[in-house]
Amino acid sequence: MSKQNKIIGIAVILTLIVAGVVYGISSNLKHNEPVKTTQEDKNQDVILSLSYDKEISEGSQEEIVIPVKLSYLPSGVFPSASMSVEFDKDKLEFIGVKKGTMQDYSKTVPEWTFDVDASNKSGVVNAIYIDKSGAKNSYYKSGFEKGKKDVVLNLVFKLKEEAKSGDMLNLNISDAVFATVNGDTDNSNLSTAKNTMKNKNLILEVR
């Protein structure tokens, strides 16, 4: 199976998981009302971005911590989310994920699920978040504040010996979804595939 087919397959599986969780939470919520889109929501572009502003030197063994930031979170309940980030597995080693700063309804920072070994084999970090509490641990607008509470999670890498000075290492968000309770009916899901959320990728330069 080609790398592209694997990515497509994983994306389909994650989408089905997200859809199933959203359906389950939707069925159990006491106040399952349509998302009320505000004028601010309509005027704002939602961008999921990778960023890193430190110098990376050849041979360095320091952790490379890359924040995954959201530019804006619209009104609504977001009980599940997923993202796939491609990286150069020959020159970068994926170490894991550290918590971000975005909070859920309970004012805690959600923990995402990921597989280090599978990521390093495929060159794709697949991370997923599912709220199993019935919405109290879902992402809400109140848990987002640009510049303070806008980091969804942090991806952690290390350089491999194969990475040399002058190398340009691409990290690309190939797919990402923040699913709402009623996303299938009111089109409120944030999705890079549906262009309701944009992505900003990253190039790391080895000095």
Language-model features, listed with the residues they occupy:
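Acidic, low-complexity intrinsically disordered segments
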Residues: 2-207
